[in-house]
């Protein structure tokens, strides 16, 4: 069983030291330009999950509350990538999208590379839940600023799966 305090420390350190930091290979942008504000305002909820599908089903019932993002962390050895991915995709299709929610995944077994930069947290299987409509508005704002210009098309196609493509 994962220790919730260790998980929180690890994920917040990853956010502060990578996700929020501008990178030259990403056009000088941070991987997520909104992460720092969410972290500093306390609108990130990090939980140790039990079962990805059912955790997300409960999240769809409860909603986001005051949070911009709800992150469930799992031991990737207990949830291999194929099983984890399918659970998250099923959750999106079966109940999250109709509640204006979207779950994005991060799993150490599925390396996400953008212009030579590894985007993964690397230690945990993560499901990151956000408001779909807010995510679409934010993506459009960033597209208007040129945020996606340096990102590979193949990566963007998968990123905007189940979402409005702002480009």
Where do the PLM segments sit?
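Expand to "…catalyze enediolate/carbanion chemistry for C-C bond making/breaking, isomerization
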Residues: 1-167
């Amino acid at each position: 069983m994962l220790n919730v305090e260790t998980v929180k420390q690890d994920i917040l350190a990853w956010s502060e030291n990578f996700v929020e930091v501008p990178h030259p290979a990403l056009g000088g942008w941070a991987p997520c330009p909104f992460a720092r504000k969410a972290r500093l305002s306390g609108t990130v909820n990090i939980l140790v999950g039990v079962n990805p599908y059912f955790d997300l089903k409960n999240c769809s019932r409860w909603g986001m509350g005051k949070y911009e993002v709800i992150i469930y962390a799992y031991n990737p050895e207990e949830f291999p990538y194929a099983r984890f991915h399918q659970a998250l995709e099923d959750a999106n299709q079966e109940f999250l999208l109709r509640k204006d929610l979207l779950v994005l995944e991060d799993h150490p077994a599925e390396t996400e590379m953008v212009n030579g930069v590894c985007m993964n947290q690397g230690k945990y299987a993560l499901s990151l839940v956000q408001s779909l409509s807010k995510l679409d508005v934010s993506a459009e704002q960033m597209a208007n600023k040129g945020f996606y210009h340096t990102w590979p098309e193949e990566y963007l196609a998968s990123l905007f799966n189940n979402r409005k493509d702002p480009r």
